[in-house]
Amino acid sequence: MSKSICSTGLRWLWVVVAVLIIDLGSKFLILQNFALGETVPLFPSLNLHYARNYGAAFSFLADSGGWQRWFFSGIAIGICVVLTVLMYRSKATQKLNNIAYALIIGGALGNLFDRLWHGFVVDMIDFYVGDWHFATFNLADSAICIGAALIVLEGFLPKPTVKEQA
């Protein structure tokens, strides 16, 4: 018996589309309006700064000769497949987990697009305090982190009790 997509977690795939539109749109604006390395202050402690990331988070393996592009692309595809299957197997009413999965999928697909299209990931958010700068990141990275945090949070929330019928 097949399930209606609306009754599964796939009902939340619109979140993936929203993340992709926002992420790829922001990267397009950076690519069209910034030179590599250019910085524009937004607020105290926050800049827009165009950087290219050839590795993973925190530029992990960025100088590894190019194989990491395909390695991280494969990981992103695998994660997207696994999370999509988990969404299909869960009920649409499991909002927190499904939204978390959708945020991670959207972020992974945004960065995957960059890796495959440009050969690098476009980063632009530069958070700093004084002279200390956090690693430059993008909106896809933010979606992935928020999704992961929601999964952890869900683990700490009390499970709904099922009322027994007499």
UniProtKB/Swiss-Prot annotation:
* Record-given protein name: Lipoprotein signal peptidase
EC number(s) stated in the UniProt entry for this protein: 3.4.23.36
List all disulphide bridges recorded for this chain: none
Q: Name one Pfam family in it.
A: Peptidase_A8
Compartment(s) of residence: Cell inner membrane
Q: Which domain of life is it from?
A: Bacteria
Which enzyme class? hydrolase
Listed InterPro entries: Peptidase_A8
> Where do transmembrane segments lie in this chain?
12-32, 70-90, 102-122, 137-157
Primary role? This protein specifically catalyzes the removal of signal peptides from prolipoproteins.
Q: Which PROSITE patterns does the record associate with it?
A: SPASE_II
Organism, per UniProt? Answer: Klebsiella pneumoniae subsp. pneumoniae (strain ATCC 700721 / MGH 78578)
NCBIfam families named among the record's database cross-references: lspA
How does the record classify its membrane topology?
Multi-pass membrane protein
| Keyword Amino-acid biosynthesis carried by entry | no
Q: Which residues are the active-site ones? A: D123, D141
Please tell me whether the keyword Ribonucleoprotein is annotated for this protein: no
Single Gene Ontology BP term?
Answer: proteolysis
Biological pathway: Protein modification; lipoprotein biosynthesis (signal peptide cleavage)
Q: Name one GO cellular component term.
A: plasma membrane
Gene behind this chain? lspA
The GO molecular function terms of this record are: aspartic-type endopeptidase activity
Q: Which family does it belong to?
A: Belongs to the peptidase A8 family.
Record's catalysed reaction(s): Release of signal peptides from bacterial membrane prolipoproteins. Hydrolyzes -Xaa-Yaa-Zaa-|-(S,diacylglyceryl)Cys-, in which Xaa is hydrophobic (preferably Leu), and Yaa (Ala or Ser) and Zaa (Gly or Ala) have small, neutral side chains
